[in-house]
Amino acid sequence: MSVLISQSVINYVEEENIPALKALLEKCKDVDERNECGQTPLMLAAEQGNVEIVKELLKNGANCNLEDLDNWTALISASKEGHIHIVEELLKSGASLEHRDMGGWTALMWACYKGRTDVVELLLSHGANPSVTGLYSVYPIIWAAGRGHADIVHLLLQNGAKVNCSDKYGTTPLVWAARKGHLECVKHLLAMGADVDQEGANSMTALIVAVKGGYTQSVKEILKRNPNVNLTDKDGNTALMIASKEGHIEIVQDLLDAGTYVNIPDRSGDTVLIGAVRGGHVEIVRALLQKYADIDIRGQDNKTALYWAVEKGNATMVRDILQCNPDTEICTKDGETPLIKATKMRNIEVVELLLDKGAKVSAVDKKGDTPLHVAIRGRSRRLAELLLRNPKDGRLLYRPNKAGETPYNIDCSHQKSILTQIFGARHLSPTETDGDMLGYDLYSSALADILSEPTMQPPICVGLYAQWGSGKSFLLKKLEDEMKTFAGQQTEPLFQFSWLIVFLTLLLCGGLGLVFAFTVDTNLAIAISLSFLALIYIFFIVIYFGGRREGESWNWAWALSTRLARHIGYLELLFKLMFVNPPELPEQTTKALPVRFLFTDYNRLSSVGGETSLAEMIATLSDACEREFGFLATRLFRVFRTEESQGKKKWKKTCCLPSFVIFLFIVGCIIAGITLLAIFRVDPKHLTVNAILISIASVVGLAFVLNCRTWWQVLDSLLNSQRKRLHSAASKLHKLKSEGFMKVLKCEVELMARMAKTIDSFTQNQTRLVVIIDGLDACEQDKVLQMLDTVRVLFSKGPFIAIFASDPHIIIKAINQNLNSVLRDSNINGHDYMRNIVHLPVFLNSRGLSNARKFLVTSATNGDITCSDTTGTQEDTDRRVSQNSLGEMTKLGSKTALNRRDTYRRRQMQRTITRQMSFDLTKLLVTEDWFSDISPQTMRRLLNIVSVTGRLLRANQITFNWDRLASWINLTEQWPYRTSWLILYLEETEGLPDQMTLKTIYERISKNIPTTKDVEPLLEIDGDIRNFEVFLSSRTPVLVARDVKTFLPCTVNLDPKLREIIADVRAAREQINIGGLAYPPLPLHEGPPRPPSGYSQPASVCSSASFNGPFPGGVVSPQPHSSYYSGLSGPQHPFYNRPFFAPYLYTPRYYPGGSQHLISRSSVKTSLPRDQNNGLPCDSGFNKQRQAAVPATGSSLLLSSMTVDVVCEKLRQIEGLDQSMMPQYCTTIKKANINGRVLSQCNIDELKKEMAMNFGDWHLFRSMVLEMRSVESQVVPEDPRFLNENSSAPVPHGESARRSSHTELPLTELSSQTPYTLNFSFEELNTLGLDEGAPRHSNLSWQSQTRRTPSLSSLNSQDSSIEISKLTDKVQAEYRDAYREYIAQMSQLEGGTGSSTISGRSSPHSTYYIGQSSSGGSIHSTLEQERGKEGELKQEDGRKSFLMKRGDVIDYSSSGVSTNEASPLDPITEEDEKSDQSGSKLLPGKKSSERPSLFQTDLKLKGGGLRYQKLPSDEDESGTEESDNTPLLKDDKDKKAEGKAERVCKSPEHSAEPIRTFIKAKEYLSDALLDKKDSSDSGVRSNESSPNHSLHNEAADDSQLEKANLIELEDEGHSGKRGMPHSLSGLQDPIIARMSICSEDKKSPSECSLIASSPEESWPACQKAYNLNRTPSTVTLNNNTAPTNRANQNFDEIEGIRETSQVILRPGPSPNPTAVQNENLKSMAHKRSQRSSYTRLSKDASELHAASSESTGFGEERESIL
């Protein structure tokens, strides 16, 4: 019953059924019954938290201190659950406070653990013990602190709890609180004085656990109590170490601020820095480095912080550590340095950082691998590039590891070599050469690298060129040291067992036994010999294994092993020399054999010349051979050398038996005989033994007798060294003579070469004998050529490297003095001779190397420089072409001499070249005309130079392209003089765009370069000028100015003194001018450029190759032959030390008609051109040109000058673009910083990816970019022109007329012409523009695409110039009288009335007495309108006599035009420049009536096409003057003008005298004009040679007809005809008026003829130029035969015609002006498509008609006139 009742009570308590419980309790008084767990109803109610039930049970007498099975009481349960009211009731009922459960926990403990703050407070108020401990001695405060109950901690501390109490492991409440970051608990404990340094479990302090958990605030609180921050846990980790590993940056900073030690290692040895690096925490690493953490402490496995950073691949961290200068060579236990590790990880950035810091590439790991081994084994080209960027490290390619592998052989073992690509690497840090101020380290290292290349095939001759006394000998010593370090890196061989060892040991022990057998006893001898044999082999075994052991204790074994191996190898070599034929060496492309060098003692050759010095030189080389190969080997080789008759068998044979068999037989006989003697002695009893002994003695004696000669040779060779033989031969020089002595030297040299080759084949090495010739420039001059010939003869075969160190100018001068007449007559000079001998010229230019960094350039694809989209396309083609194999290019046959060899030779050459260079030579061997002169020897020389230059470029961190470098080297090698002109211009001219091609630059200065060797002897060193022009124009990639700036500092084959010579000569000319001559100094390139003209010749023909006339714009005309002034003294030519004078001292002075060629002179005044009738200023033409220049773009702003904002604005202006996408496009442009310069140079595909436009927008944007690029490519060369024209004074009228985009062809009627006056005296013409005091232009600008190409008619015009110069004073006086009278008559014509008669239209052509005019028009044919009034004031001066002396001859036709600011005479147009001088020179003294007027062709442009008017023929003009189609004078003025003109014509002084006088010079002129010769040496060419090789074949037939005298062109669409200008008509003689010269655009200037020009009667452009003196007059031209050819020839020029708006100029009040489009100016607007241009061209060309047959008589007329 009680059980049921009690269960019911418990059930009611569980169900919290209070009424039922009360009812039940009233019936039953037993309330302390238990359930199965021993719990009473009170415990259950206290646990459930039902206060009423608890009260009811307590009221009914429930015992509150009863325990269940786990020793829990009701108070403990209530405290655990936090029922405060029940706890209070239980305490009132007397519950026990200190009762413990089975775990020893009291009610307070549970309340603290559970965080029941109010319960804890209640219990403490009732006196609970706060220091009670439970299991593991844990206090309530520890539980409260560990679980973050801050209030309870505070209560406990207030009630006396121990603040520093600890549990069983010593962990205090502070440690527990800090472990979980309970900040408030930590604060309370610290406030009560908790010990911050007390260690708990695992030796952790509160600071350590707080740091480990990353509780920053707790750490800060603890640090405020000044703890010991350097305490460590059980693993040796400090708080800082833990924070660094975990990456708590703020905590680390706090700890560092608290003074924590940063270098305390943990138990493994890792420091805080290493821990931070391993964790990858960059900021922490930086913080530690700022606190001077030790970066070189080795941690676990000897790894430093730097190594760990490298291993983690964190480049930022590596960079930070490297800034603190760590030791980069500390190895790990595996021997790896950080560089080796970075190389293994292929981390290019880290490798580059380490190399920049000076990490050694020579470091090796435990396997002996260097970083190069690792990189090449891993096939990483970029890593290998970085590791090899210093030339000194190139020697590591040949350093073997412990397995015997070299990086070079590792690379050879792969099918695709990367070492051939490495030498196209990007940059090398020259930190190791900073101390070498002269840059010799780079020179020596690069040369040593080339000469140490295993695949380099000697012989080779290197020329070290520098001025005498510049330190070449110092470089030689450095070069020798470098070559030794490159070569002497082979590991010492270790001892190996071999059959030779067995044979030698047996022979030694047997001999020792025989000795003892003779002297002591046979048995003892056997015992001793066997014991000795055993000892020897025990010793060998110890040495064998000990030499391969690592450690210092075995160094003695290694030393003995290497010494034994060396001596045994030498013995083996001696036996091989005696008994074995040398094997063939393998091809160097499959296995690179190690190289060794032997040097001559070059000091003994200084200041010595002749046979004795050569003997001494070879003797020193033989001494070096003896030191290297050994005394016996070198001297015995003379006896045992292999004869060619031996064949390729392995063994040398004697009597058909191998020699070693006979040798072993003889040795065996000797040993057997000695053995028998030792055993049996000499006893007559032993007959058999005696017989055997006699036989043995006979065999041995016979062998000795038969080899007496050999023994004598051996004895002679051993006693007489090669040095002794050479000296004895030198002492007998008087008997041997020179030829005999040379034969002795040759034999000795060949013997040395064969010896080196033989020993190399046995030892598997490459020996190269280096002959150093120093002091050759100090030898006697007559010995120099002999020395060079001797060296060439002696060392032209075999493994020789000849190094000349000399001053090339002294040597070449000596050669020139000693060359025989045959060579001189063959145009072979000293320079050609040296070029033929020297395979690798190196000019020491330390200044260039020091400035190399200025030219450091970068590009995206290994040096591809993109100028524009077009250039980029060309380079893509280049890259595709360059991938062709060398085998394909050797199929070219006629273009290369390489394919004449057999297949094996060609394959060997192919492999050699491919291995030697990292670029394909296809482009050098393509069918270019310039290659026709390149021989295999020249190609080898080019390869050597390119290789050295490439290494120097890499050493200076200059990125380059191999194709461009090869083109540049070829240019400097074949044409050094002209290339020096290009370089000099680039050095002296600022502001040139980098993309300007060398062809454009050459066209600017071509007329400044002398063309004959008499003017400039240095022209001898250049190749054919025609090939030079073809190379510049047709070679791809096209070289630009940027390439010159890139390559020049490291170009070793170009003599820098050439530029000094050119500058000195130019300065000397100017100095002569300043010295008092009447001529102005001629600057190289001063004066503003002129605007382009449609009449200009294409750029390709504006060259000095075909230029044989006077030099325009600052360069003199060709001077007379050198014999003309050979006896004079003057400035010495720096190169040949010969008298050198400015040619204008001997030839007439020439001034070009263009205003751009002369220096600005203040003596010439100018004003705005005005119309004389209304005084209104005329347009200068420049603004019109600019307006027409960029009509489509709407702005003259160039693409490359646009900013990002301008590009965005330009984008918004594109029609058809999606406006909704515009903000996105603009954002992309700004984000990517796409400015105009980027657009002008970037790759289109990359731009497309970056812009991410939709299809339509992209094509619109792309077309805009390409269009602006095209515009800029036209504008870029003309930028200087714009600059100059903007800054110049108003342009003269003649310039403005020609610059305008459309020029009106003026009317021929004089009534509609504006009257001009021409009143210049001789004195005025002489001094015009020549004021010396005027300042020069400071802007060094050049003309761009247009060129002046006036020329003398003869290719060899010196003779004619001399004869013309020798005109007598009487002739000149007669001419002056005639000219003075002519001026007076012309003044009368124009002076009396205000008529429009033009005074100076007809030219006296006085200038042709001296053959210098380039203007076909009259001297006074043009006059600016602004000079009208001044001309009237100067009429009197114009009549003054001008006394001309012979040296003062002036070209009046051109001297009148001097500056850009003032041009009193009309500047000569492009027709004039291209006009042939021949025709004009033949007519020097004619009056205007007798002078043949130039035939005129009307040119009109219809839609951009060419239209020609028919020219009057004989039939048209054979009648009277009135029969002319268009009268030149109107009605009443006609007769007046004719009368006055007739008076002029009848002047005796003006007519007869000049003709009579000039007939004397007819034969000279005609000879000079007709006898043209084509000479490539003189730098000029005849009119048969055309620079346009691309059109050569198509125009082959037409080219024969283009030499005709006269061309008549007619246009069927035109019925009206126009007469000739009055200025050229004279008396309108129909025969004279019929004569015309048409210029050809594509011809060279030497073939050009003459045409007149004036601003009033603008002559139309003539499209063809012909030399009247070249073609027989009987040839008739039919232009219809080849219209297509002619169109092709004109295509280049015509395709550039753009659409322009018409501009009409009205020089006078003409009632009906005719506006005709002019082609003078090619506008820089949108190009028409080439296809349409070509179609138009073909159509127009087809309209050309045949010339009139009567015109063929012009040649006879010319002769009759003469």
Swiss-Prot record:
Residues 440-953 form the KAP NTPase domain. Pfam families: Ank (PF00023), Ank_2 (PF12796), Ank_4 (PF13637), KAP_NTPase (PF07693), SAM_KIDINS220 (PF23307). Keywords: ANK repeat, Endosome, Membrane, Neurogenesis, Phosphoprotein, Repeat, Transmembrane, Transmembrane helix. GO terms for molecular function: PDZ domain binding; protein kinase binding; protein kinase regulator activity. The modification Phosphothreonine is found at residues 914, 1671, 1676. It is a multi-pass membrane protein. Changing residue 1760 to D: Loss of binding to PDZ domain of SNTA1 and SNTB2. Tyrosine phosphorylated by NTRK1, NTRK2, EPHB2 and EPHA4. Phosphorylation at Ser-918 is induced by phorbol ester treatment. Phosphorylation by NTRK2 is induced by brain-derived neurotrophic factor (BDNF) and neurotrophin-4/5. Phosphorylation by NTRK1 is induced by nerve growth factor (NGF). Disulfide bonds: none annotated. Found in a complex, at least composed of KIDINS220, MAGI2, NTRK1 and RAPGEF2; the complex is mainly formed at late endosomes in a nerve growth factor (NGF)-dependent manner. Interacts with RAPGEF2; the interaction is strengthened after NGF stimulation. Isoform 2 interacts (via C-terminal domain) with MAGI2 isoform 1 (via PDZ domain). Interacts with NTRK1, NTRK2, NTRK3, ERKL and NGFR. Can form a ternary complex with NGFR and NTRK1 and this complex is affected by the expression levels of KIDINS220/ARMS. An increase in KIDINS220/ARMS expression leads to a decreased association of NGFR and NTRK1. The transmembrane domain mediates interaction with NTRK1. This is Kinase D-interacting substrate of 220 kDa.
